[in-house]
């Protein structure tokens, strides 16, 4: 199972860690663009805010002008023309940042980040010293956090992607592959 592979990973890294997944985020969107992207030539036209590190370098390697910057700098950079397109996270956080105010084309499922996990870790020594009841309590709490986080993200991101074909104000809607969101 996934949990067994997760535990095996810590062993292979030589770490005495007991980890619990408590808050997954993802998948992240490809991002926001001023015009539709029909092929890689369209994509390569933009100065694109991407995550730093391997994702940013990967985009550069395929010919994308990748620019790394913090989340709070993205909207001002878009408004100033420092960048032309951007990715941040997923529907709810992206709309909260207001990217839809300046970019109207949003593409889901990015190339760079399928999932991010916020985990809870304790040392194996500490975990092994716990009673069976304490271990079970920790497992139940982690699973409850995981379930709550997943359901919240599905609900909130889904609400941000409510589709309508007859948007009241086309200028305030966002194109999602021929469908509109307001």
How would you label these PLM feature ranges?
Residues 5, 161, 180-181:
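Polar low-complexity intrinsically disordered regions enriched in Ser/Thr and small residues
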Residues 167-169, 174-182:
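Positively charged, low-complexity/disordered segments
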Residues 1-2, 149:
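Residue-level preference for long, well-ordered alpha-helices that form the structural scaffold
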Residues 11-165, 173:
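N-terminal secretory/targeting leader peptides
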Residues 2-9:
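A gly/proline- and charged-residue-enriched helix-loop-helix capping module
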């Amino acid at each position: 199972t996934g949990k067994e592979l997760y535990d095996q990973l810590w062993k292979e890294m030589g770490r005495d860690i007991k980890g619990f997944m408590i808050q997954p985020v993802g998948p992240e969107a490809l991002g926001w663009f001023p015009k539709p992207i029909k092929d890689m030539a369209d994509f390569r036209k933009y100065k694109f805010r991407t995550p730093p590190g391997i994702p940013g370098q990967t985009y550069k390697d395929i010919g994308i002008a990748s620019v790394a910057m913090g989340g709070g700098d993205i909207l001002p950079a878009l408004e100033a023309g420092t960048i032309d397109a951007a990715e941040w996270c997923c529907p709810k956080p992206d709309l909260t940042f207001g990217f839809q105010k300046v970019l109207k084309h949003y593409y889901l499922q990015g190339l760079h980040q399928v999932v991010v996990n916020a985990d809870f870790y304790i040392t194996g020594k500490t975990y092994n010293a716990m009673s069976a009841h304490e271990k079970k309590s920790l497992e139940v709490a982690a699973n409850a956090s995981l379930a709550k986080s997943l359901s919240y993200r599905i609900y909130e991101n889904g609400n941000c992607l409510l589709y309508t074909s007859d948007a009241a104000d086309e200028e305030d809607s966002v194109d999602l592959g021929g469908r509109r969101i307001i």
